[in-house]
Curated annotation (Swiss-Prot):
Pfam families: ATP-synt_ab, ATP-synt_ab_C, ATP-synt_ab_N. The lineage of its organism: Eukaryota, Viridiplantae, Streptophyta, Embryophyta, Tracheophyta. The gene is atpA. It comes from Calycanthus floridus var. glaucus (Eastern sweetshrub). It is found in: Plastid, Chloroplast thylakoid membrane. Its EC number is 7.1.2.2. This is ATP synthase subunit alpha, chloroplastic.
Length: 507
């Protein structure tokens, strides 16, 4: 028979008591009352904060947006098909944040910063809040460096500076995304990090943009954040903030960044859907009352930082789609009032074969010539006025039968100026090439040519100057001014090339 030793038993009990670790954990929980259409109503969660992340029993994450007296309205970051009525929900005590690092360059990610390009996980040691406060007044300085888009019409007449917010607005299929993607292609070698945010786009068009970037070597300095048309409204609403958080990470590390939101109309629609399902009162065009704040807090994050903060910059190029040219609708007027200018793309110009279809008359940059190098100011200073006068004269000339010689000359000059602003897609020009092109048109050298010959001649002229007069490019890029030496070189080269071109065309 086994003998029971009292001292041994007491030792074991004592050891167990010493090892006992009482862990007290307070968890803020609730139960699902109702779920559907990407919205869940939760009973409980008494201590939850506005904007806090909550986790459902089966792993779905949501954001608490509506805090009501008897329930909490949560928007889901997923389809929520496996969430059941009565299942439990717990508050996480965190607000939405994403990992950030250099490793994101060249990758395609979703609004939660998870890779969707099939190239494995992205390593990151730091994280940033998706919603960060914008830099204050003291943290900023005025915009003074140009961000070259490679498009003559923009860089000469509607210049964009680093740290500016310039709206690209127009009807569907007028080339808005083409202007934005060309700007990204033109940043090659400029040490600018680009972020392209696709909101509610077709997956095929996002894939096309990514392919273009890869073929042109632009992906190495670009991050693509994509939430396509089949994504939940919550993720389409979050995508721009995710892009802004990534761009901010580089801006605060003394880098220049450029971010494109394509497009904010779809983000506003996603937010409207969420708000109406949460039963928030609708306002104008059924958008909620805080839709202005939705965009202002996003676009205010673009800035040119002051010297103590390292002079980094974040340039925002939001895109907004209009319905049959109506710029006075709710979202377009909101975004126009927030940004520092707009580039208006016209369907009529696009259909008339003027591409990029920029309506120079009503497009404006509120930073102006501060965002141009001196050489461009010297050459293109009067271009916008001349084109506006030409457009007015052209409209008037339709009703007049016999025009005097001076008017005919002005019309001919204007037509050639408009012709030199035409550019093929994905063919950005360097600032030196743009200066030469504008100088040629503004000084009447193109007048002897037929309108149809202008584009062909300019290509030939640029090629000739690149190979035979490389010092021209060197002088402009080193001095940033249009010197007398440059003008002398052009006065000699352009007439020669025009003679040669006209002889070639005759044969």
């Amino acid at each position: 028979m086994v003998t029971i030793r009292a001292d041994e038993i007491s030792n074991i009990i004592r050891e167990r008591i010493e090892q006992y670790n009482r862990e007290v954990k307070i968890v803020n929980t609730g139960t699902v009352l109702q779920v559907g259409d990407g919205i869940a109503r939760i009973h409980g969660l008494d201590e939850v904060m506005a904007g806090e992340l909550v986790e459902f029993e089966e792993g779905t994450i949501g954001i608490a947006l509506n805090l009501e007296s008897n329930n909490v309205g949560v928007v889901l970051m997923g389809d929520g098909l496996t969430i059941q009525e009565g299942s439990s929900v717990k508050a996480t005590g965190r607000i939405a944040q994403i990992p950030v690092s250099e490793a994101y360059l060249g990758r395609v990610i979703n609004a939660l910063a998870k890779p969707i390009d099939g190239r494995g996980e992205i390593s990151a040691s730091e994280s940033r809040l998706i919603e960060s406060p914008a830099p204050g007044i003291i943290s900023r300085r005025s915009v003074y460096e140009p961000l070259q888009t490679g498009l003559i019409a923009i860089d000469s007449m509607i210049p964009i500076g680093r740290g500016q917010r310039e709206l690209i607005i127009g009807d569907r299929q007028t080339g808005k995304a083409a202007v934005a993607t060309d700007t990204i292609l033109n940043q090659k070698g400029q040490n600018v990090v680009c972020v392209y945010v696709a909101i509610g786009q077709k997956a095929s068009s996002v894939a096309q943009v990514v392919t273009t970037f890869q073929e042109r070597g632009a992906m190495e300095y670009t991050i693509v954040v994509a939430e396509t048309a089949d994504s939940p409204a919550t993720l389409q609403y979050l995508a721009p903030y995710t892009g802004a958080a990534l761009a901010e990470y580089f801006m605060y590390r003394e880098r220049h960044t450029s971010i494109i939101y394509d497009d904010l109309s779809k983000q506003a629609q996603a937010y409207r859907q969420m708000s109406l399902l949460l039963r928030r009162p609708p306002g104008r065009e059924a958008y909620p009352g805080d839709v202005f704040y939705l965009h202002s807090r996003l676009l205010e994050r673009a800035a040119k930082l002051s010297s103590p903060l390292g002079e980094g910059s974040m340039t925002a190029l939001p895109i907004v789609e209009t319905q049959s040219g109506d710029v006075s609708a709710y979202i377009p007027t909101n975004v126009i009032s927030i940004t520092d200018g707009q580039i208006f793309l016209s369907a009529d110009l696009f259909n008339a074969g003027i591409r990029p279809a920029i309506n120079v008359g009503i497009s404006v940059s509120r930073v102006g010539s501060a965002a141009q190098i001196k050489a461009m100011k010297q050459v293109a200073g009067k271009s916008k006025l001349e084109l506006a006068q030409f457009a007015e004269l052209e409209a008037f000339a339709q009703f007049a039968s016999d025009l005097d010689k001076a008017t005919q000359n002005q019309l001919a000059r204007g037509q050639r100026l408009r012709e030199l602003l035409k550019q093929s897609q994905a063919a950005p020009l360097t600032v030196e090439e743009q200066i030469v092109t504008i100088y040629t048109g503004a000084n009447g050298y193109l007048d002897p040519l037929e309108i149809g010959q202008v584009k062909k001649f300019l290509v030939q002229l640029r090629t000739y100057l690149k190979t035979n007069k490389p010092q021209l490019q060197e002088i402009i890029s080193s001095t940033k001014t249009f010197t007398e030496e440059v003008e002398a070189l052009l006065k000699e080269a352009i007439p020669e090339q025009i003679e040669l071109f006209l002889l070639q065309e005759q044969t």
